[in-house]
């Protein structure tokens, strides 16, 4: 077979065998030009010599050619004019033997094998073959250059197929046209999918319900129309003057209903006709092309339907409808060098349809060399990891430490546990987590919090609930918002809990929010006040001796605090004469609580 491609000079005694052998018969791109991945092309150039051969070089060329051409009929204004353009869209050369310019080389007798490989970009134009003068083709040409004889040349075509991805919408969405012709007919014409494999068949489902008594359905015609839009200069913005459009009918199906047996009840509502028709596509590209739009060649397909309606008065009406379809080439149906399907049996077409229907991305063939799961490092993939804590983040990373005015909810709760008691127990739980490395006495813990408040310039009772809201039974069960596996960290093994941050206590104090009653007693800073400078901040860190306190100030302070606690500048602001919120009546407190609850409900 390979020797039949020789042109002249090379006899069988000099080259017993010379051929191009590809690892794959064709290249497949899945998806459009903007989304398809690259493909790998590989093969071998085989040479078998029965005696020594003098050569100048051994080369292999891959060339892609695009040609657009059309003929205007003689009756048109162009008078039978022919327009065409041919371009080289791809070139690649492999030089396996090259002694140099003007030199020759003697190849001893034997077998030679020259491998080659190439990565083809996903945006390469696909092969378009089937029209007489318009095409996109790829050809291999291998040549053995000889000095005093004709070169030995062998050629082999390469087909590049652009097919749909298994996840393409054209494969999943059904196409249908439905409507009601008043006082005539209700109709529905549909196809299971928009995309159809070349060489298979198109199933069309009909549903026809007459709405006029005495109306009968006549001939039903289904046609597959192929349209060609050709452009000589697709990159030229003024190429509209060099375009040509043409259509042809690919297939025609005519059908008439059996009115005696076809009538049935549809959807348990009305009598009508419901049936399906199968339109067999041609098995050769010369009669039907695939849908494409590249290098000035655009091919599209659509289904046209005509349904004759015989009215009771004798005149004939016609229902017309159109559905778009997309024809693509499947890699499972091989096409030979003459553009015909190799296997044209119905079984092969059905296998191709089943393969497309059963494919689920990602395809196994595209992931043969992926790393196995057993070889992966589990760090970073399994959550929670070995170094992660078993519970939710701690207080510094959460907003649940906000000391809201939970005391206002006491009047609305129907349970035995008051909101203030719940807030107090949550605070005690947070304090327990803070002091996990050691267990100090309650006095040490309170003095530590007071010193932290003084360092930040915040009074000790600024975040506490109002007086009288802390009355709850000490024997009530302890409640917590944290998971049970996070409450007791004493029993957690080392390395299984999130490490504590050194600035935990400070961040916790800064992130707390005062209650509503405390916030309204605080003097509002003027809008024109600037931030404190460095000296003012340093001065606040210097311990201030306790000032003389009047009995009224000691009386206004929280009764739960000792008289030995220091007053900061914020404490004095609470007792300025202009602020009388601390002396509001119980009626005002109830109104304030009610407004707060209503505001929260709106949020």
Swiss-Prot record:
Keywords carried by this UniProt record: Ubl conjugation pathway
Compositionally biased tracts (Low complexity): 465-481
Domain of life, source organism: Eukaryota
CC annotations in GO: cytosol; plasma membrane
GO biological-process terms attached to the record: regulation of protein ubiquitination; ubiquitin-dependent endocytosis
UniProt feature, compositional bias: Basic and acidic residues: 443-455, 482-492
GO molecular function per UniProt: protein-macromolecule adaptor activity; ubiquitin protein ligase binding
Positions of the UniProt region annotated as Disordered: 375-398, 432-499
SUPFAM superfamilies the record matches: E set domains
Pfam short name (any one): Arrestin_C
Protein's job: Component of the regulatory network controlling carbon source utilization through ubiquitination and deubiquitination involving creA, creB, creC, creD and acrB. May be involved in signaling by recognizing appropriately phosphorylated substrates via its arrestin domains and then recruit a HECT-type ubiquitin ligase such as hulA, leading to ubiquitination of the substrate, providing a link between ubiquitination and phosphorylation in protein regulation and stability.
Subunit architecture: Interacts with hulA.
Family classification: Belongs to the arrestin family.
Designated name of the protein: Probable HECT-type ubiquitin ligase-interacting protein creD
Organism: Aspergillus flavus (strain ATCC 200026 / FGSC A1120 / IAM 13836 / NRRL 3357 / JCM 12722 / SRRC 167)
Annotated gene: creD
